[in-house]
Amino acid sequence: MARMHARRRGKSSSVRPARNEAPAWSNTDKAAIEKLIVDLRKEGTSASMIGLVLRDRYGVPDVKMVTGKSIGDILTENKVSSEIPEDLRDLMVKALGLRKHLGENPKDLHNKRQLHLVEAKIRRLVKYYIGTRKLPAGFTYKPENAEILLSR
């Protein structure tokens, strides 16, 4: 795949091994894993960090292979998922940081362009999440309100 905002090819990355069942050394207790996911979320850990913690500390290489559900599905099932999807939240944090930087350095044209690209990506994601009903129909991204949304 090519890059979105550059005329270059993407970088190759590692591929997960094709498996149908969990390895013998892994932790495969479904109830314990689901409880651990909910507990980590209540501590304030994001969904992607939960996956890393389960992989590195608890020996769970793939949650979906063990439980049959993704981490996001488990979080919504237990009503502890965040109101704003994680990828959108991360982009909003990035845009706020760029806005703060541009407030202090108004002549930084490279980062001004990066802010435009990030905010364009935010608007595309908002449109997608409204279509999939993960965000309410009247939701719009406004930089002034983004800081308030993220502080919740």
From Swiss-Prot:
InterPro entries: Ribosomal_uS15, Ribosomal_uS15_arc_euk, Ribosomal_uS15_N, uS15_NS1_RNA-bd_sf. One of its GO terms (biological process) is translation. The keyword Nucleotidyltransferase does not apply. SUPFAM superfamilies: S15/NS1 RNA-binding domain. The lineage of its organism: Archaea, Methanobacteriati, Methanobacteriota, Stenosarchaea group, Methanomicrobia. Part of the 30S ribosomal subunit. It comes from the Archaea. It comes from Methanoregula boonei (strain DSM 21154 / JCM 14090 / 6A8). SMART domains: Ribosomal_S13_N, Ribosomal_S15. This is Small ribosomal subunit protein uS15. Residues 1-25 are annotated as: Disordered. Residues 1-11 have a biased composition (Basic residues). One of its GO terms (molecular function) is structural constituent of ribosome.
